[in-house]
Amino acid sequence: LFVRKPQIPILIDRTDNILVEMRVQAHKGDVLNKLSLQFKEGIDLNDIKALRFFYSGTEATSRQGKHYRPVSYISSHAEGKTKAANPAYSIKQSEVTDIANVVTFTSNQPMVEGVNYYWISIEMKPEASLLTTFTVQMPMAEINNMPATIVWDGKSDVRRMGIGVRHAGDDGASAYRIPGLVTTNNGTLLGVYDIRYNSSVDLQEMVDIGVSRSTDKGQTWEPMRVAMTF
């Protein structure tokens, strides 16, 4: 079982974030029956709303290399679809809402011959702090009810939180691009960006300049304001 943790922020405002993603080279009918995750480094487990274990199918034989997902599990650009897992590639196997230091997931999904993909999603509670950090390990996994060898791709890195200040489709705009961020003398955060109403493409298009403001170090953001129109 090959396991990787992508080094991207966990967005508090998302329903699903990639916590770990997995690849299994299987024979037809093999089953990844069980696996466990262990949280370390003092995370407040009450900040976690849910953990979900997904099966994501197989791989095209023509695609070369060692990958950890067949597609992007959560879109960064599809309007209204940037906060939750793509259901076409995320078949839920189990979900845990009673979060403990060690969490166990189960599955009865038969795998196909060749490469099979899985991933675990994490959803934070809205009140979770942006300062939250944690690491996670996988102490155990079973395939066909037998212990599986777990191979990590990279070290056990610290994961951090973030907020999606703007998402595709917010306020009726197709995309937001070219961001900037400044801190004023009194600590207020100002985020600026293109508001691309019709598509994410470059000029020539209908584009305004938007501003978002936070007075609590990025934990919450005021409604968007249009700073410049063209």
Language model: regions and residue ranges:
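Asp-box/BNR beta-propeller blade signature and adjacent active/binding-site loops
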Residues: T58, Y89-S94, G114-W119, E123, ...
